[in-house]
Amino acid sequence: MSQQTHTTKKKLESAILVGVQAQTDEVFDFESTMEELASLSETCQLNVQAEFTQNRQHFDNKYYVGKGKLEEIKAYVEMNEIDVVVANDELTTAQSKTLNGNLNVKIIDRTQLILEIFALRARSKEGKLQVELAQLDYLLPRLQGHGRSLSRLGGGIGTRGPGETKLEMDRRHIRTRMNEIKHQLETVVEHRERYRNKREQNNVFQVALIGYTNAGKSSWFNALANEATYEKNLLFATLDPKTRQIQINDGFNLIISDTVGFIQKLPTTLIAAFKSTLEEAKGADLLLHVVDASHPEYRVQYDTVNQIIGDLDMGHIPQAIIFNKKDLHEGAVPTTNLPSIFVSSKNEADEEKVKQLLIEQVKSALTTYEEKVPSADADRLYFLKQHTLVTEIKFNETDATYTIKGFKKE
């Protein structure tokens, strides 16, 4: 008698979203942050049933929402047997504890969701250390009275959280672990800085791809570097920075780096933890800002990235804009006062357009030069083709020399 094996699909936890549109918090677009919260929740395998929002002058210090709204939420949670309540903001210890006590379900905030996704996406040792550092930094002030609200951060989904044993550590042990991680990351930073300094000494032009999460940075990195990088339609698909040398304009080499994507209300703990990753963009000569032009809130996303770039003291670095996903865009062509191009990573012909944009930006950032090179000096000719943007090579028969014109770094 043959045995049949039945696989049971794990039931998703049911969840509701709760957001407060505070008058004191006008930096972010509230509706788009709630839409993002739904995407973040679904990425964390939560089955979102409903959302509750409230306009207030400011967040309630005790309940996050007003007491009347809390009663409304409680009634819905009990009637529909909801498992998780997700807040659109980072909750204080008191807010989390009070909500947990009143609703008697898991309470998760936006920061925890993003930390969970980062833990899921981290592949390299550096990425995993950075995520753990951010998790512990989030946990440290919440050690007392965390109740059920931190159960997911403690490995509730798989084993990606710091683990229940770490949740039981006292502050001293957590600080010790954080210092250990920082020390390990310092080694990575020093290694990366040596490479970056070497590139700078060799006058290599450096480009960093930046943008909102899921804007298409990895797709363009793949196209320009001729590399099959991870480019699925996922939030925060790229955590570990990738740096490659690419060639444009018949020999001229430049360095291009892919970086972590940004999002509204990106937790400060993550920005701090991923400082070493973001340092790669800080050393760039050009920021190539990829924007999902098909997204209805692409202007908000564009502004969010620029705000974070400013916070990271990178606002002085020249930018060029790739308005991406032209194939999905409807409506007017997006515009900006910065150099820009409107393309689709799905269209191979657009790759040359992006390279041409790069060439124009390289020219504007470099200094013109003219140099005579003896025809016998093949090494010098090769060096100039590799490390400068050559625009003209003219052979002089009278003295058997080449006159080279182009652009180079100071």
What are these regions, as identified by a protein language model?
Residues 106-120, 126-128, 134-155, 315-320, ...:
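Canonical P-loop GTPase G-domain recognition
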Residues 1-116:
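N-terminal accessory targeting/assembly segments
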Residues 34-40, 75, 91-96, 100-101, ...:
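Conserved C-terminal guanine-recognition region of P-loop GTPase G domains, centered on the G4
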Residues 2-6, 31-35, 58-74, 240, ...:
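Switch II of P-loop NTPase G domains
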Residues 365-410:
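NTP-binding/hydrolysis catalytic cores, primarily Walker-type P-loop NTPases
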Residues 130-133, 137-140, 144-147, 168, ...:
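Alpha-helical coiled-coil heptad-repeat register
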Residues 21-25, 56-58, 90-93, 112-115, ...:
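Conserved nucleotide-binding/hydrolysis micro-motifs of P-loop NTPases
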Residues 154-268:
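Conserved G1/Walker A P-loop phosphate-binding module
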